[in-house]
């Protein structure tokens, strides 16, 4: 008897989280690209922050996919933080 209630709860949580991600989508040219890029990130807030910074500085270029492919955008690939590691997710 409890299993259908658990299934309904899980499905409603999945739908709610999907709607939340869509509602927080940025309307700038970088918003959609960074939402895709950061869709599998563990820390989406941090990923979106740095992706948007890099995207704007690199003339709205964001590599395709959720990881890698940085050769598509050399500016995005070459941007470093103060520690010398890649700034852009």
UniProtKB/Swiss-Prot annotation:
Tissue expression: Expressed in vasculature of rosette leaves and roots, cotyledon and root tips and developing seeds.
Modified how: Six disulfide bonds may be present.
InterPro entries: GASA
First and last residue of the signal peptide: 1-25
Any one Gene Ontology cellular component term annotated for this protein: extracellular region
Keywords assigned by UniProt, alphabetized: Disulfide bond, Gibberellin signaling pathway, Secreted, Signal
Principal subcellular localisation of the protein: secreted
GO BP: any one term: gibberellic acid mediated signaling pathway
Compartments where located: Secreted
Pfam annotation, one family: GASA
Chain's role: Gibberellin-regulated protein that may function in hormonal controlled steps of development such as seed germination, flowering and seed maturation.
PANTHER family linked to this entry: EXTENSIN, PROLINE-RICH PROTEIN, GIBBERELLIN-REGULATED PROTEIN 10
Family: Belongs to the GASA family.
Protein name per the record: Gibberellin-regulated protein 10
Gene, per the UniProt record: GASA10
């Amino acid at each position: 008897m409890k299993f259908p209630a658990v299934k309904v709860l899980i499905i409603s949580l999945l739908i709610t989280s999907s709607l939340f991600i869509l509602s927080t989508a940025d309307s700038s040219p970088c918003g959609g690209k960074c939402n895709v890029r950061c869709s599998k990130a563990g820390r989406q807030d941090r990923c979106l922050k740095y992706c948007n910074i890099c995207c704007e500085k690199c003339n709205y270029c964001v590599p395709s996919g959720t990881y890698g492919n940085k050769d598509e955008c050399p500016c995005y690939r070459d941007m470093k933080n103060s520690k010398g590691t890649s700034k852009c997710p």
